[in-house]
Amino acid sequence: MISILTYFGILFGILTITVIIFVALNKIQLI
């Protein structure tokens, strides 16, 4: 059984990685 904290932890982790990749792609396009 997955706890709520674990669920939000994984969700926050995926969201953070997505944001980092999005920012990285934007920086590459700006150059």
Swiss-Prot record:
It is found in: Plastid, Chloroplast thylakoid membrane. The gene is petL. Component of the cytochrome b6-f complex, which mediates electron transfer between photosystem II (PSII) and photosystem I (PSI), cyclic electron flow around PSI, and state transitions. PetL is important for photoautotrophic growth as well as for electron transfer efficiency and stability of the cytochrome b6-f complex. This is Cytochrome b6-f complex subunit 6. The 4 large subunits of the cytochrome b6-f complex are cytochrome b6, subunit IV (17 kDa polypeptide, PetD), cytochrome f and the Rieske protein, while the 4 small subunits are PetG, PetL, PetM and PetN. The complex functions as a dimer. It comes from Chaetosphaeridium globosum (Charophycean green alga). GO terms for cellular component: chloroplast thylakoid membrane; cytochrome b6f complex. Its main location: plastid. The keyword Iron does not apply. Belongs to the PetL family. It is a single-pass membrane protein. GO terms for biological process: photosynthesis. Keywords: Chloroplast, Electron transport, Membrane, Photosynthesis, Plastid, Thylakoid, Transmembrane, Transmembrane helix, Transport. GO terms for molecular function: electron transporter, transferring electrons within cytochrome b6/f complex of photosystem II activity. The chain crosses the membrane at residues 4-24. InterPro entries: Cyt_b6/f_cplx_su6.
